[in-house]
Amino acid sequence: MIRVLVVDDEALIRTGFQRILAAADGIEVVGAVSGAEALRTVREQHPDVVLLDIRMPDVDGLTVLGDIRRLPDPPVVAMLTTFDMDEYVETALRSGAAGFLLKDTDPEALPPAVQSLARGGTVLSPKVTRTVVDGYLSAGPQERPSKALQRLTGREREVLVLIAEGLSNADIAARMHLSTGTVKDHVSAILTKLEVSGRVQAALFAQRAGLLTEGAG
């Protein structure tokens, strides 16, 4: 059973997400209306996945994200955002968010997204704007993606594409018929060679480089 906490002060968004997730098999969901309540719920109920609004009235969602990430054995956190919150995405990802979902996400896509997060995958809304991707990566190495990709082996490029598709290490291992340990080694090498600090950053790099359209070859 996947335990999910939805944190949003807007009742319409919070209850809507809760209803969608509660109707899915294998998911239990609770809600919180503030950052303080979110932290208390995480400490008391130990959810597996937290969907956290970036902006809330009492405590900034990015601050709550940092507080959650500092807890022992923290849950996976994905940020809830809207198009006008683009400027917060970079900070959220650098602070350890496992991705972000737009608040108008297709209801049918929400349970699979939560399941992917629970397995250790990443979630990047298909409606992510080019501005977000380019703006986030502009703070990274100042070189063209094609140049950075030259440092990757063919196998590492394949793994990078699957990371960008949101697959966890276990999912990638099954898809590529490799051991999980081998996949972990590939992921570590990819992060080092691309000079990014996490899977979501690597996924955004792959998006900017066009790997999701052209494939890994």
Annotated model-derived regions:
Residues 26-34, 41, 196:
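Short hydrophobic/Thr-rich beta-strand motif most characteristic of the beta2 strand and flanking loop
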